[in-house]
Amino acid sequence: MQITIITVGKLKEKYLKQGIAEYTKRLGAYCSIQEIEVPDEKAPEQLSDAEMQQVKKKEGERILAKIGPDVHVYALAIEGKQRTSEQFATELDRLATYGKSKIAFVIGGSLGLAPEVMQRANDTISFSKMTFPHQLMKMILCEQIYRAYRINRNEPYHK
């Protein structure tokens, strides 16, 4: 399975880079994983609604340019569908069983995802009703993908 994680903005924090690198290394035994960072749109701190939509639209165009037509897309969004780790594992296994060998997870920038990206998504996923920095979500996502593979192979993993 080819998994792509598409994020807006460049990851700068060393501790997050290290955590993501660790899970990416572990995932190498189970799947091919690729990370794509698209540039975030520079914008002032205070934005009107129209300016926010314009920023999300530009970031969304960059995201969509990285997604092929045969890719199953999950959009990470606070209003997305919540799952248990076991449900997520079952879902990934089912996708692989039915020939969906390319999966992309999309994490938006600080303003969220453009409506066009949400429309392209085959499904949404939320890890919590709480708000997290999008850079941290990338590491949490990597851990959950790793956990899913361990669950699907009945391999022990810390609960």
From Swiss-Prot:
Gene Ontology MF: a single term: rRNA (pseudouridine-N3-)-methyltransferase activity
A GO CC term assigned to this protein in UniProt: cytoplasm
UniProt catalytic activity: pseudouridine(1915) in 23S rRNA + S-adenosyl-L-methionine = N(3)-methylpseudouridine(1915) in 23S rRNA + S-adenosyl-L-homocysteine + H(+)
Pfam families xrefs: SPOUT_MTase
Listed EC numbers: 2.1.1.177
Top EC group: transferase
Positions contributing to S-adenosyl-L-methionine binding: 76, 108, 127-132
Subunit structure, as described in the record: Homodimer.
Annotated function: Specifically methylates the pseudouridine at position 1915 (m3Psi1915) in 23S rRNA.
Name of the protein in its database record: Ribosomal RNA large subunit methyltransferase H
Organism: Exiguobacterium sibiricum (strain DSM 17290 / CCUG 55495 / CIP 109462 / JCM 13490 / 255-15)
